[in-house]
Design a protein with these regions (language model features):
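Extracellular lectin-like interaction modules
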Residues: 1-167
Length: 167
């Protein structure tokens, strides 16, 4: 079943290691940082809005395991880790996306509903990348060499489309 997490205050951190099971996070509010780990191919998912006042760290430590979180409200950075060419990540955040150091073995699909997308750490994606931004966003890659995307890249910016590689 789904796990509900609730903490208060900026120091109210939560850490969950689901072992080899699917980790489904129900509607939750974590005042501080949230760290999630799964070792299952279906991996980490959400079945309700997951609000995080600090940073989110999501790791799927099984080869080709996914992270699929479509109802995020993360105020801080997001760090992701998958392995294997099938280790895909899909994220939808209610504001911007600020990628901390992340290694994604498969594809990355990221949506910033109302905010900007940036990388405050090294973002490495082995597969294809699709980034969708809201209506008045900014895409900022502070150090071009820090964004390594080996697959195809598609960036959707207010109904305009950019395709190409980021190296």
């Amino acid at each position: 079943g789904a796990v509900t997490l609730n903490t208060t205050g900026a120091t109210g951190h939560a850490e969950v290691d689901g072992g080899t099971t699917i980790l489904d996070i129900a509607a939750s509010t974590v005042g501080g940082n949230l760290s999630l780990t799964s070792g299952h191919a279906t991996g980490i998912t959400d079945s309700g809005t997951v609000t995080v006042g600090g940073n989110l760290i999501a790791t799927n430590d099984v080869s080709n395991g996914d992270i699929n979180m479509g109802s995020l409200a993360v105020d801080g950075t997001i760090a992701l880790e998958t392995s294997g060419s099938g280790g895909d990540v899909t994220l939808v955040n209610d504001v911007g996306l600020d990628f901390a150091t992340s290694n994604i073995g498969g594809d990355l699909t990221g949506t910033a509903t109302t905010g900007n997308i940036s990388d405050s750490g090294t973002l490495t994606v082995t597969g294809a990348t699709e980034i969708t931004l809201g209506t008045t966003p900014t895409l900022t890659v502070t150090d071009v060499t820090s964004a390594s995307v080996d697959g195809d890249t598609l960036i959707i910016l207010d109904n305009s489309v950019f395709t190409g590689g980021i190296t």
